[in-house]
Amino acid sequence: MAPFGGKSLADVVSGIGGNGVGGALAAVAAALLVRLFAGPGIALLPEDEAEDDYAETEDGGGDSIRPVTIRWRNITCSLSDKSSKSVRFLLKNVSGEAKPGRLLAIMGPSGSGKTTLLNVLAGQLSLSPRLHLSGLLEVNGKPSSSKAYKLAFVRQEDLFFSQLTVRETLSFAAELQLPEISSAEERDEYVNNLLLKLGLVSCADSCVGDAKVRGISGGEKKRLSLACELIASPSVIFADEPTTGLDAFQAEKVMETLQKLAQDGHTVICSIHQPRGSVYAKFDDIVLLTEGTLVYAGPAGKEPLTYFGNFGFLCPEHVNPAEFLADLISVDYSSSETVYSSQKRVHALVDAFSQRSSSVLYATPLSMKEETKNGMRPRRKAIVERTDGWWRQFFLLLKRAWMQASRDGPTNKVRARMSVASAVIFGSVFWRMGKSQTSIQDRMGLLQVAAINTAMAALTKTVGVFPKERAIVDRERSKGSYSLGPYLLSKTIAEIPIGAAFPLMFGAVLYPMARLNPTLSRFGKFCGIVTVESFAASAMGLTVGAMVPSTEAAMAVGPSLMTVFIVFGGYYVNADNTPIIFRWIPRASLIRWAFQGLCINEFSGLKFDHQNTFDVQTGEQALERLSFGGRRIRETIAAQSRILMFWYSATYLLLEKNKPKYQKLELLVDNGETGNSGVQLDKAEVDQTEKPEDDDINQPLDDQNQTSDSDDELDEIRPFVLEGL
């Protein structure tokens, strides 16, 4: 007899009864499986080969760093509002320069555009149809699109796999990003050097931790983020408010680390709100922003105090210079009078610095440039051809996923206790059911509850965890560490043993307590059905987590979607009575197939006590009332497997579709004929051009008619000392 009841495997998987839904799901899953295994290790950008910053010095982890100077000019970023037809400027004609060996801090009040400018320079500004970004960006004197370079971007949120130690986190990062380090000894030596360099030796073997598991401190997590970014020896380091959420001591240690990295030859750029005095003293250069406009750019220390002192704004003694500068360039919204006076002061300072910086020009005028396809994506993966293959990535990620899943003691203990507790409760309610007519309804109710409980437990666990993990994966994939296929497959396989344990516990306790069909084979099939259902629910949770942006949204969408599947699960609405427009839902409902399989397993061959001829005498008659007659368990398992593959395929597609996309920089045109072609950043003289009209920010960089309005405004401001600092 042929397997699967005389049908081929393809026939079984493609659907039941020849329905089109099953065939479509199987086709999508098959296509995605081919894509999953056929994909390259790393997707490389198809542009021309870019010059490697480490072509001569890189040896799989060497410390040689090629100096990189980044110059930006007239960066303008606007956000349009279609409903009100208004435009809000996030950045207006911002210019500046970051040099190797120097720590540059972007400072300003909240909402001044610090993070926006940092994201623009790093090519990390999220893509939006409402955003318009323009300006000039050069790396070592060349347009950023023609020369790629290694960069590190340390975000405010420190996201890690919580169950790994600090050393393991760095080791996996080194293996994924530096496949050329083949021996474990070299990798361990490289990781140990990073631990020593970042001051993480004391916590190297400590668990990173999270909100549930106590781990390393916030400052240590920030330094670990830096260490992970330094794996590939980047030339440029971007840090978005690295001291946020840290106490004074930890903030000091983090900034000391950034200062040392700058002294090692890195170009370090960070955004920071209002640092303490000792932190401000570590800055080599600063850029001051207010309401998206440039107020000062140049050396830090006493130079900005001297500059603003020339206009009568004197910093009192024993006052933190950073606090003084922050108050000076902020608008006070406490009253209409303070708003007017502070705005007048800020606008005058902006105009004064714009005029001052436009007095010194570039030695060589910039030539005409056009928009490039990838001008704002200077990623390392565009210039490095990865040598690690698909399977190497898979086994590394499988090891990491298994360590994360198996070590998650608190979560696993809670899941185990809930599985046993729910089984005990249900077993007590349906204690040792007999063979009476009323037991038929009890058995159906118990099997429906078992299917719902198994699915909801797996779903809620996945949607509560995966959105956070997706953020980590998106960051690692954006660095070119690995591709999506190995990650998704490794995660699936690593979680099979842990995921199977809980439905097995549930079945082992519930089955004898309720006295379901008392044969070993039926018990094995019961556990097998709920286990496959648990895997399908987890796959559905992955899809929900890949579809929505946050854990909160996933927790709202996942159970709501599962409720729809419960309604069409075969117990509340008979499949034969389902309206035609909704008949596809039972076919896609994992609850329906699990309930059907459990009913077939329980009722087949069962005899019930009866007194009347119209009573249900056999289990087959009970199955007919549910429209499950003539079905087989293997068909339900095949349907569940088909649904599982569909959800995994949907997860793959959504993760590919929703991967981070970044805004392109539209390069402004400069024909070199105007006198205002730029500035040479020397000491306090900063690259900045005149402020364009608000209604035309994209005009060519031509000379603007300068007036003495700003001078008049400054003359009207009487010199004063900021009080109350």
From Swiss-Prot:
Q: Which keywords are on file for this protein?
A: ATP-binding, Membrane, Nucleotide-binding, Transmembrane, Transmembrane helix, Transport
Q: Name one GO cellular component term.
A: membrane
Cell location: Membrane
State one molecular function term (GO).
Answer: ATP hydrolysis activity
Q: Name all ABC transporter domain ranges.
A: 70-316
Q: Does the keyword Glycoprotein apply?
A: no
**Record-annotated ABC transmembrane type-2 domain positions:** 392-603
Q: Which residues of the sequence carry a binding annotation for ATP?
A: 108-115
One Pfam family, short name please? Answer: ABC_tran
InterPro entries found in the cross-reference section? AAA+_ATPase (IPR003593), ABC2_TM (IPR013525), ABC_transporter-like_ATP-bd (IPR003439), ABC_transporter-like_CS (IPR017871), ABCG_dom (IPR043926), ABCG_transporters (IPR050352), P-loop_NTPase (IPR027417)
User: Which residue intervals are annotated with compositional bias (Basic and acidic residues) in the record?
Assistant: 682-691
Membrane spanning stretches: 12-34, 446-466, 493-513, 528-548, 553-573
How does the protein's chain sit in the membrane according to the entry? Answer: Multi-pass membrane protein
SMART domains, alphabetically?
Answer: AAA
According to the record, the residues making up region (Disordered) are 676-725
What protein family is recorded?
Belongs to the ABC transporter superfamily. ABCG family. Eye pigment precursor importer (TC 3.A.1.204) subfamily.
Listed name of the protein: ABC transporter G family member 7
Species the sequence originates in: Arabidopsis thaliana
Q: Which gene encodes it?
A: ABCG7
